[in-house]
Amino acid sequence: MVSPVTVVKCEGPKLVPFFKATCVYFVLWLPTSSPSWFSALIKCLPIFCLWVFLLAHGVNFLVSHRSAKMIFAGLIFSAVGDAFLIWQEQGYFVHGLLMFAFAHILYSSAFGMKPLDLRTGAVMAFLSSILYSLLYSYLSGPFTYLVAVYTALIAFMAWRAVAGVQLCNDLWTWTKLSACIGAVLFVVSDFTIAVNKFCFPVPCSRTIIMATYYTAQMLISLSAVECRDEDDYRKKK
């Protein structure tokens, strides 16, 4: 297994633009009440930087490794979803929801179905049912079904990410753990969005949502480097 220190040395510099773009978003903190193409650009910029992070490994890397390709495609849908959510009060919330639904399908595909780990799947199904039941009484119209489907998709994505971390069998890698933590943070971010939009105002909701969201996307993107072997990193040292 590649050492975390080795990977940080090799991958860290490629993530510098992402960290800078994230800082720009939080420093500018553009008001959500005045949506614009500029605010959409600033919000999407960290995700664009994650595109660059994956592309920095080479186009051949993306083309030849299915999981990296799926994650890259998921980031594209995520950026489009982010742009739609800038204008959510103008009727584009559902559009953003659909884009992120596609992103979760792609991430699930990237994480794969092995090991299956039905026990973790059952736990995720139980937890997602609880979360949806908390939202259900506040939902109406098509959102009753849309939120149910979205909850199922993100729970499935989280299941596949968590299932990859086999701590008890000592078969885990730091990149699988990265995907696991990223998926859980994505659930936290999206559940906060749902509670804040449909139930009641959540204190510091935007900070919680965006901090967990950007961290989740970064960790999921980092999991793509699982495709690289130890020799690749030795060449970079």
Describe the role of every protein-language-model region.
Residues 1-237:
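Polytopic alpha-helical membrane-helix bundles and their juxtamembrane interface segments
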